[in-house]
């Protein structure tokens, strides 16, 4: 009788598997592989090697607390001669001395998560069980059979592997790129992402069913959308929009997801204070990329928050044009969400591809504060019956806006406002470049096209099909040069009379600070022209001077000022409204890299900023992050005040761990100048 087969050890071949599965950054101390693609194992036996004629090897892979073959969370499979498509399999690849090298294959629809792998070796009537190790299984956008497959290597690099990028803020007429450190492969982040799945309410209610459903990126995306906010659960971030962040961190101060996720884990899954839309979106992007789902952050300018699903945002204003209506339905200056790439077998053909997911807690979906995934194509087509939450996302990019002026006697007059169009300049970072890509066309057909009319008809969006009222008099807000924080500047109400008649009216100009979500602050400039005459076929530009001393104490960290012009013509009973959001530029953060960037060789970054204000800055700090360049976030305090016009300079030590292109991301804070962002690309060569 043959001697019993005894396993001495199992080599999980971390280096080779990490290279083959694009998980090298995760495979330093553990095995992380992607589903639907074989990975290597080497079995080392004591005494003798495996003999096919006398030995039987049966493998068992399980995930979750209650694994079962029926749920797809347990797999039993024997060593065989060939792989079977769509099934777990083990195939011998090489045999020498007392070692046996294997290819282990996983189905392209296996649940993602943490697995335990064991072996039962039988020789005749003898048998022994051995624990081979543990591994983590991720979605695989390189595998054609996987629901997240992308056929472009450049897109896989950008949307799965790239650890830094940009989030777009500012305004539709002044788009500002904000650098962000996603850091999905940084130390401990994968474990945190898996923990996030394991504390979601669906797992707590029925762990076996939840783990089974993790085979679907649609399901996982929806769970992540709900878990990034903490409104229903032990989610990551608490949202706050009132500019009172003293007991936490201002949403504008974050520069990456890593610090947020680590804080959440460190504090026992307690909510991190505070987030706003781009922070929710960026953290969701980190989690989804880490799990292997191609994902990008998207910004929509002039984004509607339509609560009652009538695709209409109504503003009620007093006779001076000031909004007096409820703030629950608003036009946000911009709003961020994410798109993830996946098939939709639960929907009709044609709805695969980019899916919108919005983790910012706004409205409940099936009892939970989450939104999506909904096919971007369904939004474009006006197919509002499509899962999930199509009406809400459709309204964000297509809602109509009506302004009502309420007179002293209570009567309402509809104003003409062509300056505010919902759903503009929908933006994301370009693939492989530090540029902005405009993806508005993927959400909306060209304005006025037959396809747009069909989509609006399908969505029953009748407001958009009504021709806009024209009077022959138009007004828009123009800006001058030098729109920098700390400066005085001019804005202009530019009025055009395209009619053969003279028009006379009253012009009210008002500038107020504003948060990105449309909440107005105090006035910082006004003008009231009681009698303004417009000659036939003429133009006029009326200036409004905005002084730093007026806005310095009330400008929010959004750096936005809303300028409103209201032209009232009593003779024609006409109200012409124009608005524009102005973004004030922060000073530039300059970053110099001292020395040649080489792998595993110390490096110094010199970071500087010039105070643009007329007063000194105190409490100055620089915070630095950069996946692959610096292990943990570093903060450098500046002990002395920085006088007006003076330059402040600090140095930070770096240790690049990986060859390639990385971003060093910087945030500057002080008492009077906050959330100033900067970045520098660093190309690291081999040592």
Curated annotation (Swiss-Prot):
Acyltransferase activity is regulated by the binding of GTP and Ca(2+): inactivated by GTP, which stabilizes its closed structure, thereby obstructing the accessibility of substrates to the active sites. In contrast, Ca(2+) acts as a cofactor by inducing conformational change to the active open form. In absence of Ca(2+), Mg(2+) may bind Ca(2+)-binding sites, promoting GTP-binding and subsequent inhibition of the acyltransferase activity. Extracellularly reduced and activated by CLIC3. Disulfide bonds join 230-370, 370-371. Keywords: Acetylation, Acyltransferase, Calcium, Cell membrane, Chromosome, Cytoplasm, Disulfide bond, Extracellular matrix, GTP-binding, Hydrolase, Isopeptide bond, Membrane, Metal-binding, Mitochondrion, Nucleotide-binding, Nucleus, Protease, S-nitrosylation, Secreted, Transferase. It is found in: Cytoplasm, Cytosol; Nucleus; Chromosome; Secreted, Extracellular space, Extracellular matrix. GTP binds at residues 476-483, 580-583. It catalyses: L-glutaminyl-[protein] + L-lysyl-[protein] = [protein]-L-lysyl-N(6)-5-L-glutamyl-[protein] + NH4(+); L-glutaminyl-[protein] + serotonin = 5-serotonyl-L-glutamyl-[protein] + NH4(+); L-glutaminyl-[protein] + dopamine = 5-dopaminyl-L-glutamyl-[protein] + NH4(+); L-glutaminyl-[protein] + histamine = 5-histaminyl-L-glutamyl-[protein] + NH4(+). The active site is at 277, 335, 358. InterPro entries: Ig-like_fold, Ig_E-set, Papain-like_cys_pep_sf, Transglutaminase, Transglutaminase-like, Transglutaminase-like_sf, Transglutaminase_animal, Transglutaminase_AS. GO terms for molecular function: calcium ion binding; GTP binding; histone dopaminyltransferase activity; histone serotonyltransferase activity; peptidase activity; peptide histaminyltransferase activity; peptide noradrenalinyltransferase activity; peptide serotonyltransferase activity. The modification N-acetylalanine is found at residue 2. One of its GO terms (biological process) is bone development. It holds the Pfam family Transglut_N. Its cofactor is Ca(2+). PROSITE patterns: TRANSGLUTAMINASES. There is a cross-link at residue 633 (Isoglutamyl lysine isopeptide (Gln-Lys) (interchain with K-?)). Induction: By retinoic acid. GO terms for cellular component: chromatin; cytosol; extracellular region; mitochondrion; nucleus; plasma membrane. Ca(2+) binds at residues 398, 400, 437, 447, 452, 539. Its EC number is 2.3.2.13, 3.4.-.-, 3.5.1.44, 2.3.1.-. Calcium-dependent acyltransferase that catalyzes the formation of covalent bonds between peptide-bound glutamine and various primary amines, such as gamma-amino group of peptide-bound lysine, or mono- and polyamines, thereby producing cross-linked or aminated proteins, respectively. Involved in many biological processes, such as bone development, angiogenesis, wound healing, cellular differentiation, chromatin modification and apoptosis. Belongs to the transglutaminase superfamily. Transglutaminase family. This is Protein-glutamine gamma-glutamyltransferase 2. It comes from Bos taurus (Bovine). The lineage of its organism: Eukaryota, Metazoa, Chordata, Craniata, Vertebrata. The gene is TGM2.
């Amino acid at each position: 009788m043959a001697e019993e087969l005894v396993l001495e050890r199992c080599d999980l071949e971390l280096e080779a598997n990490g290279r083959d599965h694009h998980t090298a950054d995760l495979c330093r101390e553990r095995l992380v592989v992607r589903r639907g693609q074989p990975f290597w194992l080497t079995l080392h036996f004591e005494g003798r090697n495996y003999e096919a004629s006398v030995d039987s090897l049966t493998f068992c892979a399980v995930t979750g607390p209650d694994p079962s073959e029926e749920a797809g969370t347990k797999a039993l499979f024997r060593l065989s001669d060939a792989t079977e498509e769509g099934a777990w399999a083990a195939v011998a690849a090489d045999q020498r001395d007392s070692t046996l090298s294997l290819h282990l294959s996983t189905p392209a629809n296996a649940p993602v998560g943490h697995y335990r792998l064991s072996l039962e070796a039988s020789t005749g009537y003898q048998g022994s069980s051995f624990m081979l190790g543990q591994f983590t299984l991720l979605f695989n956008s390189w595998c054609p059979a996987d629901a997240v497959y992308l056929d472009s290597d450049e897109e896989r690099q950008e949307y799965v592997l790239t650890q830094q990028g940009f989030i777009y803020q500012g305004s539709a007429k002044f788009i500002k790129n904000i650098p962000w450190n996603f850091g999905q492969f940084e130390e401990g982040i994968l474990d945190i992402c898996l923990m996030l799945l394991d504390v979601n309410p669906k797992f707590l209610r029925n762990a076996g069913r939840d783990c089974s459903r993790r085979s679907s990126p649609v399901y996982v995306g929806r769970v992540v959308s709900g878990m990034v906010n903490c409104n229903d659960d032990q989610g990551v971030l608490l949202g706050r929009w009132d500019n009172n962040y003293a007991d936490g961190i201002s949403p504008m101060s974050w520069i990456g997801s890593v610090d947020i996720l680590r804080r959440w884990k460190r504090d026992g899954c307690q909510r991190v204070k505070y987030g706003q839309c781009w922070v929710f979106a960026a953290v969701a992007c980190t989690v989804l990329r880490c799990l292997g789902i191609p994902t990008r952050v998207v910004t929509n300018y002039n984004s509607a928050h339509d609560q009652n699903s009538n695709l209409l945002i109504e503003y009620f204003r007093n006779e001076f044009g000031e909004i007096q209506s409820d703030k629950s339905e608003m036009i946000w200056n911009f709003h961020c969400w994410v798109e993830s790439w996946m098939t939709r077998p639960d929907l009709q053909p044609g709805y695969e591809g980019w899916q919108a997911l919005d983790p910012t807690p706004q409205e409940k979906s099936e009892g939970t504060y989450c939104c999506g995934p909904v096919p971007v194509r369904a939004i474009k087509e006006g197919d509002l019956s499509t899962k999930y939450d199509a009406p809400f996302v459709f309204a964000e990019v297509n809602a109509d806006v009506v302004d009502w002026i309420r007179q002293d006697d209570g009567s309402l007059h509809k104003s003409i406002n062509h300056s505010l169009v919902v759903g503009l300049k929908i933006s994301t970072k370009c693939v492989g470049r530090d540029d902005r890509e405009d993806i508005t066309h993927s959400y909306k057909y060209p304005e006025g096209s037959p396809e747009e009319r069909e989509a609006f008809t399908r969505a029953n969006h009748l407001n958009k099909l009504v021709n806009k009222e024209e009077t022959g008099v138009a007004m828009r807000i123009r800006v001058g040069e030098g729109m920098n924080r700390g400066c005085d500047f001019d804005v202009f109400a530019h009025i055009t009379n395209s009619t053969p008649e003279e028009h006379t009216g009253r012009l009210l100009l008002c500038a107020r600070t504003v948060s990105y979500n449309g909440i107005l602050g105090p006035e910082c400039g006004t003008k009231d022209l009681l009698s303004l005459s417009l000659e036939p076929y003429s133009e006029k530009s009326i200036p409004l001077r905005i002084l730093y001393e007026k806005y310095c104490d009330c400008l929010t960290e959004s750096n936005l000022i809303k300028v409103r012009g209201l032209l009232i013509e009593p003779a024609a009973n006409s109200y012409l409204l124009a608005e524009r959001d102005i973004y004030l530029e922060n000073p530039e953060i300059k970053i110099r890299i001292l020395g040649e960037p080489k792998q595993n060789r110390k490096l110094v970054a010199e970071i500087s900023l010039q105070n643009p204000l007329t007063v000194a800055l105190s409490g100055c700090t620089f915070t630095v992050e950069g996946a692959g360049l610096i292990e943990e976030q570093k903060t450098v305090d500046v002990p002395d005040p920085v006088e007006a016009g003076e330059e402040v300079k600090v140095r930070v030590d770096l240790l690049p761990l990986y060859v390639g292109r990385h971003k060093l991301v910087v945030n500057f804070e002080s008492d009077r100048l906050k959330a100033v962002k900067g970045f520098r690309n660093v190309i690291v060569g081999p040592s």
